[in-house]
C-alpha cells in the first residue's frame, strides 16, 4: 500500500479503495511483522479521507484455488481491525473461476457474518456452519478447518501471500490434512 501524500488531501467525494496485495495473507494484519507498513499507511489514509476507505481483501490463493488456504481467521481478524480503524467497507475477492475451491462457502459465511457484526467470534461461526452444512460430517470438517488454520500459526516463520506455492504447508501438515479430509467422507 502506497503511503498517502504528505500535504494533499482527497476531495470530500473521493473514496479510497485499498487493495491488500503483496502482504502476508495467512496471519492477521495486526500481528504479522510483514504487514506493518500496510497498517501504518492504511491508518494514515483513514485519517485524511473524509469519504471513507474501502478495502479490497484477497481471500484465496490465486496460484492454486483448490489447495488448502488458511485464511478464515486472518481475514476475520482483519475485518474486526478494519471496523476499529473506521474503514467504511470490505470486499473479499475469492475464487472466481471454479466452484471447487478450498472451503469457499464456509469462508463466505464466516466473513459475511463478521461484516454484519465484527464482534462475533470466528470459531463459533465455523462450528455453526459445519453443523448446518455438513451434517454427519460436521465434527470431521470442523477438525479439518481448524487443522488448516493451525498449519501456519506455528511456526510463525511461515508467511504466504495471495499467489503462494504449496510449500507454505509442511509435509506433516499436508499428511494430517489428508487424514482429516478422509474422515469427512467415511
List each language-model region with its residue ranges.
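Catalytic domains of carbohydrate-active enzymes that cleave complex glycans
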Residues: 2-6, 86-88, 111-186
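Repeat-unit-sized solenoid/scaffold elements
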Residues: 13-35, 82-97, 118, 165-177
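Surface-exposed beta-strand edges and their flanking turn/coil or helix-capping segments
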Residues: 8-9, 29-31, 68-70, 105, ...
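Structured mid-domain segments that build the active-site/substrate or prosthetic-cofactor binding neighborhood
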Residues: 36-137, 143
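Gly/Pro-rich turn-and-neighbor structural signature
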Residues: 1-47, 57
Amino acid at each position: 500500500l502506497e503511503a498517502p501524500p504528505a500535504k494533499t488531501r482527497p476531495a470530500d467525494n473521493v473514496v479510497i479503495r485499498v487493495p491488500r496485495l503483496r502482504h502476508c495473507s495467512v496471519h492477521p494484519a495486526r500481528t504479522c511483522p510483514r504487514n506493518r507498513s500496510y497498517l501504518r499507511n492504511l491508518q494514515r489514509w483513514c485519517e485524511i479521507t473524509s469519504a471513507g476507505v474501502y478495502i479490497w481483501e484477497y481471500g484465496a490463493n490465486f496460484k492454486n484455488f483448490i489447495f488448502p488456504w488458511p485464511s478464515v481467521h486472518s481475514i476475520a481478524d482483519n475485518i474486526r481491525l478494519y471496523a476499529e480503524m473506521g474503514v467504511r467497507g470490505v470486499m473479499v475477492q475469492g475464487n472466481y473461476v471454479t466452484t471447487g475451491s478450498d472451503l469457499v462457502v464456509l469462508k463466505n459465511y464466516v466473513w459475511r457474518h463478521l461484516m454484519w457484526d465484527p464482534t462475533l467470534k470466528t470459531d463459533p461461526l465455523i462450528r455453526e456452519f459445519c453443523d448446518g452444512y455438513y451434517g454427519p460430517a460436521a465434527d470431521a470438517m470442523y477438525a479439518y478447518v481448524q487443522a488448516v488454520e493451525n498449519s501456519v500459526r506455528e511456526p510463525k516463520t511461515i508467511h504466504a501471500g495471495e499467489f503462494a506455492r504449496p510449500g507454505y504447508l509442511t509435509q506433516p501438515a499436508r499428511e494430517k490434512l489428508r487424514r482429516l479430509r478422509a474422515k469427512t467422507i467415511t
